[in-house]
Every structure is written in C-alpha cells, then in structure tokens.
C-alpha cells in the first residue's frame, strides 16, 4: 500500500553568554580524540540487562562490529568525521543500520543548491530553499519552513500517495476545520444487515469518494452501491506480502553483538531464551517473506469464501488500486465513526465499529494496522461511555511501555536502533548543551525524564575528549520511580568513572508537576542546562506554567526541548482524532518502510509504544488523558510567555542530523528548519520538533 505520510519544543540570566551561530563549539579533532582515548580506561564490553529494575545494570554496550572500518567523510567537517567515526562503535552513538555504508556524498550535497561555495567554515545555507512544508497540516501548520539539503530533494520521494494522503492533500480541505466538518451519512449501507451475521459479507457496500476529499462540503456524499461481495472482498483483503522499499536495510541493521533476542511467535514476548541479534531475526523474517513471495497464489475465490464463512480476513493478493480503495474506505469509516461519537450518536457509532471490526487487522499493511489501533480505541471510548456506571478509573492507567523492565529495554532498543527518531532527539539536544557548556569547568544537567539514561553516554564521551580535560559533570535525573532513577544513576556513574569524567548523580523520584526548587540542589558556579525529551506534553495544563517559571528562576544557560510535532490537545474530540490519525499513519508508514513485512519487532513497537498512545488520545478524557502533544508554535508561545528566548540550533546540529539520516537507507525521512528549530519528519509530515531556549 502506498505511503500514509500526509502531514499526519536554555537559559541563563546574566550568568554567561551563548555562542553565536558562527562561533559554535566544535568537537575535538580526530588526532586529539585518539590521543585522549589512550588515557581513558575502556568501557566494559558487557551489557547486562536487569530484570528487576527500569534501567539496565550497565550502560556500556558491546561495540558495534562492522565488516569494514567505516568513516563518515565530510570534507568541510573534519570535527564530525572524528566524532562519528569514534562513536559508530557504540550502541548509544549513531549506530548505523547500514553495514556497508556507501561512499560519502560531496560536501555540496549536504547544503542547499544556493550554497555560497565556502565549505571550510561550516556555513550551511539552510535558508536558501525556504518554503512551506509540502502540503498543509490539517490543524494550521507552522509558518513556512525550509527543507534542508539532500534529504528533501525531489528525487527522494519515498512511496506514493496513500489513501490518507489523498484525503488530507485534497485541493478542497476545508473539512479540516472542525467547525465545518460534516461527513455524509452512511446509513444506507448499514441498514438491514447490522444484526445479521450470515448476510454481512454480501450486504457490505463499497464507498466511493468524491473528487476532492472526504467531505469538502455538505453536498459531497458517498455513493452507496448495492451488493458487490467479490469486489469488496478483493479490495479489503490483505496482500500476501507487502512491498518493501528498504532494500537491503534490515539484513545489516545491527551488529552481531546486539542484545535483542530471538522471539519465537509461540513463546511469550521477550522470552529470555536463545540469544540472537536483531539483524539475524530480521534477516530470517526477510527470508521467510521471500519464500512466501515465490509460492504461487492459488484458489483466491475459496479463500474469499473462507473469509465469509469464518469471519476472518486472511492475506490475499491485491492490486495496488484495490489496496488504495480499501484504504480509502477504512479512512472514511474511521472518520464517520469518530463523527458519530463526537455527536453522541452512539447507535450509529456502534454500527460503524461493527463493520470496522470486520475489515481491520493488526497484521496487514500500515493502513490496516493503524486502522486497527484506532478502531480498538474508539471501541474503548464507546464502551466507557455506554457503561451502566461510567468510571474513568476503570480505564487502565496510561503506560507507554509494558511493565516488565526487560521488555522495556528490548522494545526501546529496537526503536532506538532501527529508527532515527530517538537519536535525532538526543543528539540535537546534546549538541546544543555541549555548545552552551563551552569553557565551563562545572556543569549541571537537569534531565526531566531520565529513563534509562540513553542520552548521556555520548555526551560524556564528548566531554571526555574536550581539550583540557572533562569538566565536573553533575546530572539530576527526574523520573516517577525513585528505584529506577537510582539504578540509572549507578550505571551512569560507572560509565563516567571509566571515562575519567568527574561525575555526580542526583536522583529525584517525583512527577514533574510535584517538583520543588530545592530538589534541583542548585550550586553556585555551575553552568546549568535543563533537558526535556518528549516529556513536557504529559504535564497537566494547570501545572506547566508553574514548572516553566520555576525552571526559568534557576537561571539555566540552555533549555532543550524535543516534542512530538502534533496537536493532540485540542478541545474537540473530532479534531484530536483527525490529527492523531494523520500523525500515527505517518509513523506506521515509516515503520513499514523500515521493517520487513510481518516483522515481529515492528509489531512490538506498534503494540507497546504507539498503540497505547493512540488509545489514550482517543478513548480518554479529563485527567486520564495524559498524551497531550502540542505543535512547535504552541510551545514557542508558551516559552516566550514565560520569559524565554529562542536559541537557533547551530550549523553543526544540522550537519549532525543530516549525517544521522544518511545512515538510514529509507529515503522518506525529512529534515526541516523552522525559525532556528529543527523538525524531523516522514515524507511531508513532521514527527519531532527540537528547540533550544535561554532567558
């Protein structure tokens, strides 16, 4: 099926000065890094997973092994060559998913076509192609952003238009405005067969879309056809094997020292049995996929009859246009059901859900899988609404990861290694903090969501290689579980000791809304940075202002914020639903291009990371709804309202992000600049936004 990427957040007051964009700190050269490394005790090569805590027992992962020594070449950025070449050997660095990295691109390929030709000063003309992101976001996108360099070249188009993209990129997209959103009624195909299981497959009518989108105006409508069971089944059936655009991506994703284990479909998730690398698992999956492709598809009609008889959708060969029609129908059914829920027409919503449950599956293409997540979320919302004694406490509390710590580590590591999203957030924030700490002898970082501490080993190594030696580093780690935060601190302390970095860790086991100034243990003479990655959106609306004011009063040198670029906190349910469908469709599409078809690793990411987010956004209200993503413009207004000023991310940060994306064979990832901030997206839909601030 085609792409589903439609368009689906620093601070020191009179303490120090930040460097201008033309004088950003450069990391040490390769020679100095090599000489410094000889003085440093090497990091332990054993990575032990702790099943009883939220954090690993050691942050010293085994070195990544490549067939050849790989060096990221950049003629005008020798500092980055040494940095990345040294850190390609660790899981917390840029772990290249492509073992046989192609020859480096010329320096000009990393800059816009209007580059002035001076490649020796790290001056990237990132404003040369300033323009709006291709396609307008449905909830009023941010001001015009400029695509950056090679990864936004027209030749890198990725996959084609998807059903959702056709809907959102429609020339007439007034329906994006919630006030005017009006889906046509679909009762005609829902009338007589709702309670007749034996007649459902034959009476299900196909939907046709008018030329400009779902519902450009009230005059637009679906054409409810009569009985067409065969064509419908062909259209809604899943393809036997999904097309894979990643080429040889997964065969060389990770080294043989990866800590991810073989997952047997018959065993429990992440059973600690025989150990094998993630690359080997994915290689096996691709081999199975190739074998399935070689088998001739026969007896399609009996399979369709089996679908009717057993009420189960099984993979069938489907033409691209049939997949497109199927995707469009799923989109329209989802939107119609969401509109019925928003209008409190629960009987009609139940009818739509009844049909959705018959045609969606978590095992199909990206549209089928994302539709399955949203169908489940709509069902949960409707069930809670229609309960005899409604109680929000009956809903499971939101937890973005499974409770078992070993599963947390493994799933998070899959996401960290296979996709650039988390690395982009960590490296971009680290670069801004590193530059703000230039020449400082005592530095303090407050991490508002420390988790397993994955962000900081690379930063520690950069400090250890700094000319003149590493400064004294203190990290205050914040997290809801005191035990987990302390365990992360123990691991980071061991790593800092091995790197000869003077280090102190201060754990704070509190929710962000419960933080008090004395918990930061601020000390005179320390340069302070506050870091938040995908965390501030979960702070209650009535607490976020006080939290930011308290951070401002600490007079930090820099505040780094990375947040999901989505508007999932609007006042209207239908608007949140539309935005979430758009956003997660792009994410699922990027996973489709990254993993092979029927990948168990991809299924775990979707089931344990993204599906719970969708469930919380769609099914929960009030205090139970904690996934409240906001767009960059909202964070910008909020930060400026609390006395912060934006700090433009440097050319080095842009270069670093481009090198990171160059390590992934998928060509759908896009890097965009927006008034000094960087956005990483899939195709024309921004996914993450990174920004830096000071007071």
Curated annotation (Swiss-Prot):
Residues 528-616 are annotated as: PFYRE. A motif (LxCxE motif) lies at residues 335-339. Residues 283-292 have a biased composition (Basic and acidic residues). Its main location: nucleus. Residues 487-518 are annotated as: Leucine repeat II (LRII). Induction: Accumulates after inoculation with Rhizophagus irregularis. PFTA repeats lie at residues 105-139. One of its GO terms (biological process) is regulation of DNA-templated transcription. Disruption phenotype: Ineffective symbiosis with arbuscular mycorrhiza (AM) fungi (e.g. Rhizophagus irregularis, Simiglomus hoi and Acaulospora scrobiculata), with rare colonizations characterized by malformed arbuscules. Reduced AM fungi-mediated induction of AM-related genes involved at later stages of symbiosis (e.g. VAPYRIN, PT4, PT5, STR, STR2, RAM2, SBT and BCP). Residues 328-393 are annotated as: Leucine repeat I (LRI). Residues 281-304 are annotated as: Disordered. Forms homodimer in nucleus and cytoplasm. Interacts with NSP2, RAD1 and TF80. This is GRAS family protein RAM1. The lineage of its organism: Eukaryota, Viridiplantae, Streptophyta, Embryophyta, Tracheophyta.
